[in-house]
Amino acid sequence: SFIQDLPFSKNHFHKYLPLFPFAIEQFDLSKYDLIISSSHSVAKGVITSPDQLHISYIHSPMRYAWDQMNIYLMKSSYKKFGINLFLRFILQKLRQWDYVSTVRVDKLIANSTFTAKRIKKYWGRESKIIHPPVNTNYFTPNNNRGEFYLSVSRLVPNKRVDLLVKAFNKLHFPLIIVGEGPEKKDLEKIANNNIQFLGFQEDTEIKVLM
């Protein structure tokens, strides 16, 4: 979309969140009979015609616009009154758009039972559940693995890796965290010595850790 051409969008695209709905609606998909979107934010909001079939694979209703709004607003950079108030207004508008735009989808597919419940609660619609595929022939337990717990995740607020870190700070069990994200530095600051951050790892390395 046009957002990728805006200043600093490569590393700070989330700053343009208020523009996401407008951006997704600019895509011209008129030459396609079938539209399949994969959405945790705005992808489901593409505009289609009555003659097109739109199937959307949903990973979640827009978390930061619904039940996890306050988690995002608790970030230190958002706590100033003026910024916080403005973001609350923006997120409330996004919540309205998130709800209204679901009528554009003909068939909703949820990636889990939990997501299906969220779709029903926030959008009032039923969905079919298809779990994300995992190559179980490739990802198998490593009999030579070390004695530690493993977490593989994006380090973003909604994943609540901070709760994991706080729990292992108290348990003192060894924990390895794989993943990158804006929360990484804050998590490293609160983590004890029993917790190790490896950053991004290829599947080959994750397989060894498993």
Placement of each model-derived feature along the sequence:
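Acidic anion/phosphate-binding donor-loop and adjacent secondary structure
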Residues: 117, 121, 128-129, 133-147, ...
